[in-house]
């Protein structure tokens, strides 16, 4: 049974991941407060507790410094290729910020106290801490978890999806979208049908989250038919003379056999994600491809949402393919989005007269410093 396109294309249904909100740090603060409460209720003397905390803190910071020394042993061989020959840049990259040193000094002060009842000297305690930290590093037990890697790449905007989204925007959408209305206006002179659908004069970008892209849309759905090409945009870019950019205009046939024009294309960077997951050299799994496809949609949505040049000139249509093949799923999805745009346009038009009258009123009032009659029949 065919599923309602609105449910398959809604953001809630697609489960687009939003940026993480720092709840892990909040949880750490809560657990820290719980630990303080437990220590307070234990009734133990305060001085030994502070000394133990300082020794543990020193051991942790010592581990950070030892890890930096191990990183330095590798990075010194990449001094010129990665760090422009700057030894200071290598040191800053390998070792933590300055406040780590302060924590190390504060924690290390605990080792200056006399040895405890167990007879272990401060020197032995420091040596054992170094031994444990180096053992952890040698066994590779300090690797970041998958969640930490994901958060790090997303927060620094250095994942594959973010790079593809920016490349798609800078190299293509920012070039062609500002001229879209002009191209549609020119094409409408020979295709009067377009004038009745000005509310959908946008580039409709299909974003299949499974990365299944058809090169020929007419083969994907028989209700989608090619109509014409929009006027070409010709530019000289990156040494290529008269580089050509163009869009294709399609008509979508609805259940009443009516035709709706639509400028339509797939988001081509998704082909890159699909090819990467099929190439062993890329080491890109299917799960990573699906995650990056969703992040690509989110990144592109955010980039276009903040672009003044592209405002009102595009429509992102993200969707998941149905589990069971549906011959007219794609055309039904596109028609639903076209109807949504038409409703949105009507809502704007209903609010427009109120806005226009208020503008006229403000112009009449501000035309002179003296009070003026608002009625035209008053002298």
Curated annotation (Swiss-Prot):
Gene3D superfamilies: 1.20.5.5200, Stimulator of interferon genes protein. CDD domains: STING_C_metazoan-like. 2',3'-cGAMP binds at residues 167-172, 243-246, 268. InterPro entries: STING, STING_C_chordates, STING_C_sf, STING_LBD, STING_TM. Coiled coil: none annotated. It is a multi-pass membrane protein. It catalyses: H(+)(in) = H(+)(out). Residues 1-23, 76-97, 140-379 are cytoplasmic. 3',3'-c-di-GMP binds at residues 167, 172, 243-246, 268. GO terms for biological process: activation of innate immune response; autophagosome assembly; cGAS/STING signaling pathway; defense response to virus; innate immune response; positive regulation of interferon-beta production; positive regulation of macroautophagy; positive regulation of type I interferon production. Keywords: Autophagy, Cytoplasm, Cytoplasmic vesicle, Endoplasmic reticulum, Golgi apparatus, Immunity, Innate immunity, Ion channel, Ion transport, Membrane, Nucleotide-binding, Phosphoprotein, Transmembrane, Transmembrane helix, Transport. It is found in: Endoplasmic reticulum membrane; Cytoplasm, Perinuclear region; Endoplasmic reticulum-Golgi intermediate compartment membrane; Golgi apparatus membrane. Residues 158-345 are annotated as: Cyclic dinucleotide-binding domain (CBD). Residues 41-50, 112-121 are lumenal. In absence of cGAMP, the transmembrane and cytoplasmic regions interact to form an integrated, domain-swapped dimeric assembly. In absence of cyclic nucleotide (c-di-GMP or cGAMP), the protein is autoinhibited by an intramolecular interaction between the cyclic dinucleotide-binding domain (CBD) and the C-terminal tail (CTT). Following cGAMP-binding, the cyclic dinucleotide-binding domain (CBD) is closed, leading to a 180 degrees rotation of the CBD domain relative to the transmembrane domain. The pLxIS motif constitutes an IRF3-binding motif: following phosphorylation by TBK1, the phosphorylated pLxIS motif of STING1 recruits IRF3. IRF3 is then phosphorylated and activated by TBK1 to induce type-I interferons and other cytokines. Facilitator of innate immune signaling that acts as a sensor of cytosolic DNA from bacteria and viruses and promotes the production of type I interferon (IFN-alpha and IFN-beta). Innate immune response is triggered in response to non-CpG double-stranded DNA from viruses and bacteria delivered to the cytoplasm. Acts by binding cyclic dinucleotides: recognizes and binds cyclic di-GMP (c-di-GMP), a second messenger produced by bacteria, and cyclic GMP-AMP (cGAMP), a messenger produced by CGAS in response to DNA virus in the cytosol. Homodimer; forms a homodimer in absence of cyclic nucleotide (c-di-GMP or cGAMP). Homotetramer; in presence of cyclic nucleotide (c-di-GMP or cGAMP), forms tetramers and higher-order oligomers through side-by-side packing. Interacts (when phosphorylated) with IRF3; following activation and phosphorylation on the pLxIS motif by TBK1, recruits IRF3. Belongs to the STING family. This is Stimulator of interferon genes protein.
């Amino acid at each position: 049974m065919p599923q309602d396109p609105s449910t398959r294309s809604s953001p809630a249904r697609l489960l687009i991941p939003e940026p993480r909100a720092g709840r892990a740090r909040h949880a750490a603060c809560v657990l820290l407060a719980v630990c303080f409460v437990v220590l307070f209720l234990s009734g133990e003397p305060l001085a030994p507790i502070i000394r133990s905390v300082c020794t543990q803190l020193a051991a942790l910071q010592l581990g950070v410094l030892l890890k930096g020394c191990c990183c330095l042993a590798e990075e010194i061989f990449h001094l010129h290729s990665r760090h422009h020959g700057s030894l200071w840049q290598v040191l800053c990259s390998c070792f933590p910020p300055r406040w780590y040193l302060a924590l190390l000094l504060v924690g290390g002060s605990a080792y200056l106290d006399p040895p405890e009842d167990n007879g272990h000297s401060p020197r032995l305690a420091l040596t054992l801490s170094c031994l444990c930290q180096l053992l952890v590093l040698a066994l590779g037990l300090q690797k970041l978890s998958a969640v930490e890697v994901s958060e790090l790449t997303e927060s620094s905007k250095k994942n594959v999806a973010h790079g593809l989204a920016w490349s798609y925007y800078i190299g293509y959408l920012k070039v062609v979208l500002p001229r879209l209305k002009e191209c549609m206006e020119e094409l409408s002179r020979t295709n009067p049908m377009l004038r009745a659908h000005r509310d959908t004069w946008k580039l409709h970008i299909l974003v299949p989250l499974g990365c299944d892209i058809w090169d020929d849309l007419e083969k994907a759905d028989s209700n989608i038919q090619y109509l014409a090409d929009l006027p070409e945009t010709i530019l000289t870019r990156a040494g290529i003379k008269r580089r050509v950019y163009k869009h294709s205009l399609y008509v979508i046939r609805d259940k009443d056999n009516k035709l709706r024009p639509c400028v339509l294309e797939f988001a081509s960077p998704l082909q890159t994600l699909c090819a990467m997951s099929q190439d062993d050299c890329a080491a890109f799994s299917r799960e990573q491809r699906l995650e990056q496809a969703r992040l690509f949609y989110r990144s592109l949505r955010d980039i276009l949402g903040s672009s003044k040049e592209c405002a009102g000139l595009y429509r992102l249509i993200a969707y998941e393919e149905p589990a069971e093949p549906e011959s007219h799923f794609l055309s039904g999805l596109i028609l639903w989005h076209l109807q949504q745009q038409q409703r949105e346009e009507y809502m704007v038009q209903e609010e427009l007269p109120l806005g226009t009258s208020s503008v006229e009123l403000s112009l009449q009032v501000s035309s002179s410093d003296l009070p003026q009659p608002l009625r035209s029949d008053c002298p």
